A protein has these predicted regions:
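Acidic donor-binding/catalytic loop of UDP-sugar-dependent glycosyltransferases
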Residues: 35, 74-88, 159
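Hydrophobic helical membrane-anchoring modules
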Residues: 159-217
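Conserved donor NDP-sugar-binding/catalytic core segment of glycosyltransferases
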Residues: 80-109
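A conserved acidic beta->alpha catalytic loop
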Residues: 16, 29-37, 76
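Short, well-formed alpha-helical segments that are part of the catalytic scaffolds
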Residues: 4-19
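Acidic helix N-cap motif at the loop->helix transition within catalytic regions
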Residues: 8-12, 34-42
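Glycine-rich, basic loop-to-helix element that forms the pyrophosphate-binding segment
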Residues: 48-64
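Short aromatic/hydrophobic "clamp" motif used to bind/position activated sugar donors
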Residues: 69
Length: 217
């Protein structure tokens, strides 16, 4: 779990994960100045790294000893029995995948948006990190881990992963935080996300795009 100044959410998120047996919990802090590290240490192994989600997730992967790596964002709420669903998918031969999502503040309009996004994800196998990406550890290292770019590392990683083998979007639904949309304005944020993703797919530098993407903490 990559974190930076997440004292409001870290404890609740880790309490859920700690309640599931058989998980090795690793929190990678990118330089928090609040109580994030102290709270996380009650439930997980905490390491530090330079800031940057890709850098932090790669650092956590190097510390992990399991056969499956599972990258969970602090503001993603996982469905019941999520670990067993991940294990079952890998046992079926998938090299990785992620969960379906909906927002944690649903409305008919935003349910439609997430339904369309789930459909896109199922077709193209491009997973955002808010979907709690999982991957076989050996496959993760074969493809070189997350590209250490400042933005859309999850999309770039998905491209590499789908070339390595079969991936799956699970039907089980994880709740994605609406906080980014609430802070920036829902429609404005939706349009910005679409523009930034389209620009990235056209080859615009992720370093340039990262400057346009606001931190919501």
């Amino acid at each position: 779990m990559p974190v930076l100044n997440e004292e409001k959410l870290i404890e609740g998120s880790l309490q859920v994960l700690a309640g599931w047996p058989g998980l090795e919990l690793i929190v990678v802090d990118g330089g928090s100045v609040d109580r994030t590290i102290r709270l996380a240490a009650r439930y997980a192994k905490v390491i530090t790294s330079p800031p940057g989600r890709a850098v932090q997730m790669n650092a956590g992967a190097r510390e992990a000893g399991g056969e499956i790596l599972w990258f969970v964002h602090v503001d993603t709420t996982l469905p019941p029995d999520a670990p067993n669903q991940v294990r079952a998918a890998v046992a079926e031969g998938f090299v990785g995948g992620a969960f379906s999502t909906r927002f944690d503040e649903p409305t008919p309009f935003w349910d439609l948006i997430t339904c369309l996004d789930n459909h896109r994800t199922r077709i193209f196998h491009v997973y955002f990190g808010s979907r709690a990406i999982f991957v076989r550890a050996d496959t993760f290292w074969e493809v070189g881990g997350f590209p250490e770019i400042p933005f859309l590392e999850d999309v770039a990683f998905s491209r590499k992963l789908r070339r390595a083998g079969r991936t799956v979007m699970l039907d089980a639904v994880a709740l994605e935080s609406f906080r980014r949309f609430r802070k920036s304005g829902p429609i404005r944020q939706l349009l910005l996300d679409m523009i930034l993703l389209g620009a990235f797919e056209l080859g615009v530098s992720p370093w340039f795009l990262a400057r346009l993407y606001k931190d919501v903490r």
